[in-house]
Amino acid sequence: MKAIIVLLMVVTSNADRICTGITSSNSPHVVKTATQGEVNVTGVIPLTTTPTKSHFANLKGTKTRGKLCPNCLNCTDLDVALARPMCIGTIPSAKASILHEVRPVTSGCFPIMHDRTKIRQLPNLLRGYENIRLSTHNVINAERAPGGPYRLGTSGSCPNVTSKSGFFATMAWAVPRDNKTATNPLTVEVPYICTKGEDQITVWGFHSDNKNQMNKLYGDSNPQKFTSSVNGVTTHYVSQIGGFPNQTEDGGLPQSGRIVVDYMVQKPGKTGTIVYQRGVLLPQKVWCASGRSKVIKGSLPLIGEADCLHEKYGGLNKSKPYYTGEHAKAIGNCPIWVKTPLKLANGTKYRPPAKLLKER
């Protein structure tokens, strides 16, 4: 606290005697106290700041992930999550991740019916893990799966390094080689193949088309039934036949069909089950993921470093312990949101100058 100088002047003369008491200058600082309401004080320290919007940044002291695969050029995060050819690369480990893509999330290779499953959530699911890797081996032998033998279908919109036609590495498009007939529901078990106790994210789906194409590919033009089961959760689907407008993906041929893609999360040692009919997209390479990465909505590119990442303001450096303005999710070493500004009184209570006393 600042010391108060008390000056007592006594002037004696033949004239009147004038006394002055405690004096201080006028104070513009007002603080609200719990017991006395608003009080004028001689000094305050501001404890709050009101941020302005800025670019997002890397979080100080941690690895921050923007795109799932920074080196996968011209690829959406869904492309990476489905392992589209030319979009397969290393996903860096990170303690914090930026959710930067807006809906609708798209992927090339083949038109996807996004709204029938939770597939749009797959990139965000992966983003929530600190460490993510794609398995080197396939989880099942798709060509010899029940109902086969199968040839593996491809799309001209999915060129890879060796061919002008390919498909997602996470799935195998199972097209019967010779036995193009209707089939009763078939069952395949999906084993756990991750090797480090990670969560296993297994992608699968099914293809449907108009009646002519369904007969040509599968020998059955009726709606097909599909089921996935894992960790006690079972999901059912029935394919839609026809009624799709032609759609072109990334300069490929117009497609009259659609694919529905879903995923299941297998905990260590847990086996999943897929029950299917014609048109199944059998799981192949799986994601093995571990650790936790904090996820926040933001935008790219990430420029520089910041103490805090805030969904509304971007990267913030903590100059005060509290902030006012828009309240939103934030991660890192962040100020605390308060509704009104806070001040710390570091002076004394203001006292007005004593009245002049005139004695006769």
From Swiss-Prot:
Alphabetical GO biological process terms: fusion of virus membrane with host endosome membrane; fusion of virus membrane with host plasma membrane; symbiont entry into host cell; virion attachment to host cell
Location of this chain's protein in the cell: Virion membrane; Host apical cell membrane
Name by which UniProt lists this protein: Hemagglutinin
Assembly and interaction partners: Homotrimer of disulfide-linked HA1-HA2.
Membrane topology of this protein: Single-pass type I membrane protein
Molecular function via GO: host cell surface receptor binding
Organism: Influenza B virus (strain B/Bangkok/163/1990)
Function, in words: Binds to sialic acid-containing receptors on the cell surface, bringing about the attachment of the virus particle to the cell. Plays a major role in the determination of host range restriction and virulence. Class I viral fusion protein. Responsible for penetration of the virus into the cell cytoplasm by mediating the fusion of the membrane of the endocytosed virus particle with the endosomal membrane. Low pH in endosomes induce an irreversible conformational change in HA2, releasing the fusion hydrophobic peptide. Several trimers are required to form a competent fusion pore.
Residues the record marks as carrying a glycan: N40, N74, N160, N179, N246, N317, N346
Additional notes on this entry: Major glycoprotein, comprises over 80% of the envelope proteins present in virus particle.
PTM comment text: In natural infection, inactive HA is matured into HA1 and HA2 outside the cell by one or more trypsin-like, arginine-specific endoprotease secreted by the bronchial epithelial cells. One identified protease that may be involved in this process is secreted in lungs by club cells. Palmitoylated.
